[in-house]
Amino acid sequence: MDVNPTLLFLKVPVQNAISTTFPYTGDPPYSHGTGTGYTMDTVNRTHQYSEKGKWTTNTETGAPQLNPIDGPLPEDNEPSGYAQTDCVLEAMAFLEESHPGIFENSCLETMEVVQQTRVDRLTQGRQTYDWTLNRNQPAATALANTIEVFRSNGLTANESGRLIDFLKDVMESMDKEEMEITTHFQRKRRVRDNMTKKMVTQRTIGKKKQRVNKRSYLIRALTLNTMTKDAERGKLKRRAIATPGMQIRGFVYFVETLARSICEKLEQSGLPVGGNEKKAKLANVVRKMMTNSQDTELSFTITGDNTKWNENQNPRMFLAMITYITKNQPEWFRNVLSIAPIMFSNKMARLGKGYMFESKSMKLRTQIPAEMLASIDLKYFNESTRKKIEKIRPLLIDGTASLSPGMMMGMFNMLSTVLGVSILNLGQKRYTKTTYWWDGLQSSDDFALIVNAPNHEGIQAGVDRFYRTCKLVGINMSKKKSYINRTGTFEFTSFFYRYGFVANFSMELPSFGVSGINESADMSIGVTVIKNNMINNDLGPATAQMALQLFIKDYRYTYRCHRGDTQIQTRRSFELKKLWEQTRSKAGLLVSDGGPNLYNIRNLHIPEVCLKWELMDEDYQGRLCNPLNPFVSHKEIESVNNAVVMPAHGPAKSMEYEAVATTHSWIPKRNRSILNTSQRGILEDEQMYQKCCNLFEKFFPSSSYRRPVGISSMVEAMVSRARIDARIDFESGRIKKEEFAEIMKICSTIEELRRQK
């Protein structure tokens, strides 16, 4: 059926058609090869923006460092990072004046968090730079390795399990003259197989000890590993992102906790809320500006874009902000929060894998690791790479580049938002002292500025003043990429506002489709995505019905589970036809067993098993929901699971979906090839860690506990919890005396074993 696309838009107001212009269908671009070039770009650009600053040398690591703070005031419109300390402090003071008590209260909230956060908070997150192995690892493994090394070097504060104690260890580790670390390596040897008498290669994993002196350790502790950001749409060039190591992460977490607490209290902040809550917050600011400008004033809005936000921010400025925000707070608290910006002022950027060379004539490939870039002859490189390397050479130490100015992407989103809002806050009439005034919205580096004035000259003057005020704190509004409109039409964080927010449905397109977890989860996630978009994103009933039909079709092709009475032949069709024929109530078969689809837009909230339960043959029910079915390795049954869905913008979102455990909720087994590699020891550590955490969660279901505070270990906490629960269950008659006695005995045994250890 041919559709003339223009017909689709006859009834649609033009602003709703914004969706069709977004680059969100199809696969996003991924990066291949090394990120070294992108990282060098970042380092060189950052230094260029701050080039008129003062050069110093770090006494501990010998790294050359550039400090642009209080540098020359800009004379042109080029981006620059010369923030003025007194201007930043004054902006903070005015922010506090217009929000009395905001800093004080946020500090109190943060102090409570600091005292209660457990070190396992650092296991959240994906890849983390593991300084012991000098490469990226899953967060939990990197943390376990760090704690293991600390312990073997006599640092034991972290055993209490509080994050703050782990951070004490980090501080102490930096004073040590040397650290002993364990690295994994692989040995291969040829042995004869007893059974087949053939020679086979046997791999063994070894751990070897290695001593690292203070300077090398500091460099590793201050290193951010870099990667290329994947799946970025609408860009021609890729860019580098950073992943910090465990020494930095905890400190950053506390700073961001404080900043988040402040952002929650600021009406102009687009963080940390999201979705509909964010839209409501933003609509309020717009409403305020429009109501005040009805008769006499003009109101204009800038859809703003900042040039290289991260590369012009400066950790020293963040230190000044924190010093101001935490004034009058206890000394220990101020110290803990100052460490993150200080570490960032001394950070090192790891250049990644290096370059790959291949000779077409000799069919040779060779890797030039980043460590060699300092000394290699540049004649092998092309013009642009040669320039990059020449520029970065003075900054190189052991394959990392000293990068004092600038903040790598995504590290201090909340705190930089506070800085942005403090400039928006200066737009009140009592501060501008003229006829123009401004307000706006800020979310990390994205902003919208609303300026009101009696006439066009006033608007122009207001924008100019805002622009210049931003320059004073190292924020560079891009005159090329920002545009101005009558208030009522603007874009902010990919929300399009036209007398109210317009649903930008194309953003959600990537999350439609089959996720590929397993048959049960995929069905549930698929219909939940459609349901959520009907609620939040103006997905109309007709389109939703069509999306549902397309999803079912996609699902059937993915799992080769076409209806039992279909003509389509697949590997599964023989089995599914047989099942179809011997089933009395065919409507009861799940779609993944070749059954019909009973979903429509009214019942998307019901899990498929529940929807069809009454229609199922009894023996089918028995097979489907039988935990003893030998073909299924079962997850524990939780009524609500979390799926990771990929919206087009921003990070992957976690989305809840109802999960009914059936024989279709299988978990694919881990690929065995990993078991023969040097990763094996790491894998075992990780599984061990996982088991401990799961066990702990069993004792303290997250709904019922605030993380235990104090110095008891996980084991002690679990034992005492078991005793309490057992006593309650025994006294209420839920368990017998014998069972109670047995539990008590087990608890004592565990304590005894711990004492012997």
From Swiss-Prot:
Residues 52-82 are annotated as: Disordered. Residues 286-483 form the RdRp catalytic domain. Phosphorylated by host PRKCA. Its main location: host cell. One of its GO terms (molecular function) is RNA-directed RNA polymerase activity. Its EC number is 2.7.7.48. Pfam families: Flu_PB1. Keywords: Eukaryotic host gene expression shutoff by virus, Eukaryotic host transcription shutoff by virus, Host cytoplasm, Host gene expression shutoff by virus, Host nucleus, Host-virus interaction, Inhibition of host RNA polymerase II by virus, Nucleotide-binding, Nucleotidyltransferase, Phosphoprotein, RNA-directed RNA polymerase, Transferase, Viral RNA replication, Viral transcription. InterPro entries: RNA-dir_pol_NSvirus (IPR007099), RNA_pol_PB1_influenza (IPR001407). Belongs to the influenza viruses polymerase PB1 family. Influenza RNA polymerase is composed of three subunits: PB1, PB2 and PA. Interacts (via N-terminus) with PA (via C-terminus). Interacts (via C-terminus) with PB2 (via N-terminus); this interaction is essential for transcription initiation. This is RNA-directed RNA polymerase catalytic subunit. It comes from Influenza A virus (strain A/England/878/1969 H3N2).
